Amino acid sequence: MPDPATYRPAPGSIPVEPGVYRFRDQHGRVIYVGKAKSLRSRLTSYFADVASLAPRTRQLVTTAAKVEWTVVGTEVEALQLEYTWIKEFDPRFNVRYRDDKSYPVLAVTLGEEFPRLMVYRGPRRKGVRYFGPYSHAWAIRETLDLLTRVFPARTCSAGVFKRHRQIDRPCLLGYIDKCSAPCIGRVDAAQHRQIVADFCDFLSGKTDRFARALEQQMNAAAEQLDFERAARLRDDLSALKRAMEKQAVVLGDGTDADVVAFADDELEAAVQVFHVRGGRVRGQRGWIVEKPGEPGDSGIQLVEQFLTQFYGDQAALDDAADESANPVPREVLVPCLPSNAEELASWLSGLRGSRVVLRVPRRGDKRALAETVHRNAEDALQQHKLKRASDFNARSAALQSIQDSLGLADAPLRIECVDVSHVQGTDVVGSLVVFEDGLPRKSDYRHFGIREAAGQGRSDDVACIAEVTRRRFLRHLRDQSDPDLLSPERKSRRFAYPPNLYVVDGGAPQVNAASAVIDELGVTDVAVIGLAKRLEEVWVPSEPDPIIMPRNSEGLYLLQRVRDEAHRFAITYHRSKRSTRMTASALDSVPGLGEHRRKALVTHFGSIARLKEATVDEITAVPGIGVATATAVHDALRPDSSGAAR
């Protein structure tokens, strides 16, 4: 463990100007990024008295082996550079505000020809507009069920849409008027996009005009004695009002604001955000984060770090055209103002494209809403602590059990496991999964297409394990020897750290093969074991007999979870490769024919069989297909009649 005194900058060498600094560990990996008004004042605080630092900060300075800094002109520049580096390097000691993917949102795929409304979970994508998040998926489905009476937009998947377009018959929703059936041409693309635009306007808070329009149409139908239409419009109006009731007005001035609240203890903080648009709560998000423990850290620093990371991420994905969809609202309400509130507001204004106000609510509706958000944060932290206490105890017991059973010097905080999957030597793939502190770290998972140990219907599981192991640790050695992280190709350095425990799915042959590769590469301090499936035996290299861990052992249970996760990950990738191979089309081999034009041909003719019967002139009629390409397609599908049919 490095001594902070060994890399402490010389007195007077640190500039007093504002800037951004980076701590690196002994492998050259950036482990912390921070900024300061005065680099000298901030960095000196890390080395003045290490014993008096907060536990997490003390761990930071004793893990680091080097500190670097970059001087900037203003604090706004420092904010931007800090955000960029945190995104690029993903430092382990920085607070990580991961968007909670468990929260469902209502997504509108505006990038498609016929936009779709759907329930969605996952990372944000360009070309898609999001409403929410909602606390439950059923709440979105209930909202969609109400609103598609009035805004009959498409909700089906691409496969369902394509199938009904081919059979020229709408689905059930089309028959009951909950979909405008663009698949069969009941409305064209422009008309459908207008329906979707009205739907988005309604969810954005522009509700009154739709209610007034429906009421006017209902009254007009009644005056014309068209009571059936009037009854249908009455039901539509009722559905619209029920949807409006679900979004009560919380801010009487109809403002757009995000209300942020924190609840924290010595180690962690709960963050809650209510997104208010047009005076109504449109969504809620929550995070639990580890506090960085930086000198003088407090709620003020949490506010600054959260706003920088959250709005930086949201603005990076924003392509909204209208005001209500802007991810940065006019007003951000926080529990306390950070020390650089003016610079932060300026930076947020730059992201938004117009002025953003950063303030603490003092009275009225905004104060009441802020208190509600704070209560939500307190409840979230309390629930997390109860769950964390039981989970942490179980994980600690599992890691301790593995350490004791295998005779390791330390608990295996990072465990990696490899597995191989194939069917009779075809589509041979390997997988590597990573568990840190007993939890899966999915961002570090990797697939491997086996190159040397398999092919042409042959597969050697032992050689495949050796190949995956060699590629994994060669990557580790390469990352370790090149600490320059600033070049774009060095951004992903997930394997700069070696695992404490390397697990292979198999018995003595597999574990001996992996161990031989690791020894050959000169990698030390990595324990290697194999976990055999049938009797759950733990094999150690060069040992004639396995280790038998107790069946009720928490350690064995964790190893089984790791092994099963590697198996699941390998099977998933294998099935994907096999499916791709089995569904390969005869069009794939046509030179100059890309995926877009292949889809256009199949869509136009309905199937490969019909395309085979087409002449060159008929193929040329497809938009984007020229004579040369049509001839190549014709000859590829009907090689026996090349040049005959025109």
UniProtKB/Swiss-Prot annotation:
Query: Where does the signal peptide begin and end?
Result: none
All copies of the GIY-YIG domain together span 16-95
Query: Which keywords, in A-to-Z order, does the entry hold?
Result: Cytoplasm, DNA damage, DNA excision, DNA repair, Excision nuclease, SOS response
InterPro entries from the UniProt entry: GIY-YIG_endonuc (IPR000305), GIY-YIG_endonuc_sf (IPR035901), GIY-YIG_UvrC_Cho (IPR047296), Hlx-hairpin-Hlx_DNA-bd_motif (IPR003583), RuvA_2-like (IPR010994), UVR_dom (IPR001943), UVR_dom_sf (IPR036876), UvrABC_protein_C (IPR050066)
Q: Name one GO biological process term.
A: nucleotide-excision repair
Q: Which domain of life is it from?
A: Bacteria
Where in the cell? Cytoplasm
Q: Which GO terms describe its molecular function?
A: DNA binding; excinuclease ABC activity
Q: What GO CC terms are in its UniProt record?
A: cytoplasm; excinuclease repair complex; peptidoglycan-based cell wall; plasma membrane
- The UVR domain sits at 208-243
Family annotation (SMART domains): GIYc (SM00465), HhH1 (SM00278)
Q: What is the similarity comment for this entry?
A: Belongs to the UvrC family.
> What does the record note on quaternary structure?
Interacts with UvrB in an incision complex.
Q: What does this protein do?
A: The UvrABC repair system catalyzes the recognition and processing of DNA lesions. UvrC both incises the 5' and 3' sides of the lesion. The N-terminal half is responsible for the 3' incision and the C-terminal half is responsible for the 5' incision.
Q: What is this protein called?
A: UvrABC system protein C
Organism listed in the record: Mycobacterium tuberculosis (strain ATCC 25618 / H37Rv)
Question: What high-level taxonomic lineage is stated for the organism?
Answer: Bacteria, Bacillati, Actinomycetota, Actinomycetes, Mycobacteriales
